[in-house]
UniProtKB/Swiss-Prot annotation:
Tissue expression from the record: Red blood cells.
SUPFAM superfamilies tied to this protein: Globin-like
Domain of life: Eukaryota
Gene that this polypeptide is encoded by: HBG2
Biological role: Gamma chains make up the fetal hemoglobin F, in combination with alpha chains.
Annotated residues for binding of heme b: 64, 93
Name the UniProt record assigns to this protein: Hemoglobin subunit gamma-2
Length: 147
């Protein structure tokens, strides 16, 4: 897992303070389900996922996206212990939900894309580098329970 410099932490925390968890979370999960349709199988209970517009307008997708991003907010407060922060979620996604750990990497990359869209010029290459390191760390932590 990557080591976070003080600069990384400041960069991540600064942008995070401006993130609308509901909007960015819903858009991130929605885009994951549209761009990588095989991920939809984990969300059978979410109802209509038949088209991009159905997915992006689905209230359950938005609600779960917010939940995902809220948990990410907890990680941002504990960047030096991502594995510990995500131990229970890793266990849930591995043992109970059987989610392919590759999906965590995909979700992280989609989040970076959504942040770039939302923050435009403010999302500089340096900011992206810190966020890529963070989403890679989170994906690794969430995958830690897998054998």
């Amino acid at each position: 897992m990557g080591h976070f410099t003080e600069e990384d932490k400041a960069t991540i925390t600064s942008l995070w303070g401006k993130v609308n968890v509901e909007d960015v979370g819903g858009e991130t999960l929605g885009r994951l389900l549209v761009v990588y349709p095989w991920t939809q199988r984990f969300f059978d209970s979410f109802g209509n996922l038949s088209s991009a517009s159905a997915i992006m307008g689905n209230p359950k997708v938005k609600a779960h996206g917010k939940k995902v991003l809220t948990s990410l907010g907890g990680a941002i407060k504990n960047l030096d212990d991502l594995k510990g922060t995500f131990a229970q979620l890793s266990e849930l996604h591995c043992d109970k939900l059987h989610v392919d750990p590759e999906n965590f990497r995909l979700l992280g990359n989609v989040l970076v894309t959504v942040l770039a869209i939302h923050f435009g010029k403010e999302f500089t290459p340096e900011v992206q580098a810190s966020w890529q390191k963070m989403v890679a760390g989170v994906a690794s932590a969430l995958s830690s329970r897998y054998h």
